[in-house]
From Swiss-Prot:
Its main location: cytoplasm. InterPro entries: Pept_tRNA_hydro (IPR001328), Pept_tRNA_hydro_CS (IPR018171), Pept_tRNA_hydro_sf (IPR036416). The lineage of its organism: Bacteria, Bacillati, Bacillota, Bacilli, Lactobacillales. Pfam families: Pept_tRNA_hydro (PF01195). This is Peptidyl-tRNA hydrolase. The keyword Cytoplasm applies. It comes from Lactobacillus johnsonii (strain CNCM I-12250 / La1 / NCC 533). Monomer. The record marks N9 as: Discriminates between blocked and unblocked aminoacyl-tRNA. NCBIfam families: pth (TIGR00447).
């Protein structure tokens, strides 16, 4: 069984903001594949599907970003999902807008959602699909991550979401982190 989760903040106020890149990437995948998050439990919106013979749970935690780990840990514990079978999709300010990077483990990189997941799972041994949003140039970090993408930036993000769909499909097919890193980094 696989768990694929996008990180973001709940509510319309944050809907299309840079910090909700994880939600947007997951929403793109779900929409392209005719899926919806039809359950509300474990402090998140989720669905369980069978894809290519694999049980897959898609999750968007409805805690705020900094508490994302609570929802993810509840799902992982309930369904007995191993950390290496989890893929977390999130924004990354240390990468250019629209750049994708896969990681199998590692530090949080200062991302509070990732810190929360590490604390709640008790490990950093879970897969990440990081999508770049870059550092702000002339505004605060908070203003930057809570603002939407402009048109040029959105084009780069749309391409990243297309690539993320391929990453998700390969992850579901059982491709390991090394394969994903070689293919997409």
């Amino acid at each position: 069984m696989k768990l694929i989760t996008g990180l973001g903040n709940p509510g319309r106020k944050y809907d299309q903001t840079k910090h909700n890149t994880g939600f947007m990437a997951l929403d793109h995948y779900l929409e392209k594949n005719g899926l919806t998050l039809d359950k509300n439990k474990f402090e998140g919106l989720w669905t369980k599907q069978k894809i290519n013979g694999e049980d897959v749970i898609f999750l968007e935690p409805q805690t705020f970003m900094n508490d994302s780990g609570k929802s993810i840990a509840q799902v992982a514990n309930f369904f007995k999902i191993k950390p290496e079978d989890i893929l977390v999709i999130h924004d990354d300010m240390d990468m250019p807008i629209g750049k994708i990077r896969i990681r199998a483990n590692g530090k949080s990189g200062g991302h509070n959602g990732i810190k929360s997941i590490m604390a709640c799972l008790g490990t950093n041994n879970f897969n990440r699909l990081k999508i770049g949003i870059r550092h702000p140039e002339n505004e605060s970090v908070v203003s930057w991550v809570l603002s939407p993408f402009n048109n040029d930036q959105q084009k780069l993000m749309d391409a990243a979401f297309e690539t993320s769909e391929n990453v998700i499909n390969d992850f579901i097919k059982g491709k390991n982190a090394q394969y994903l890193m070689n293919q997409y980094n």
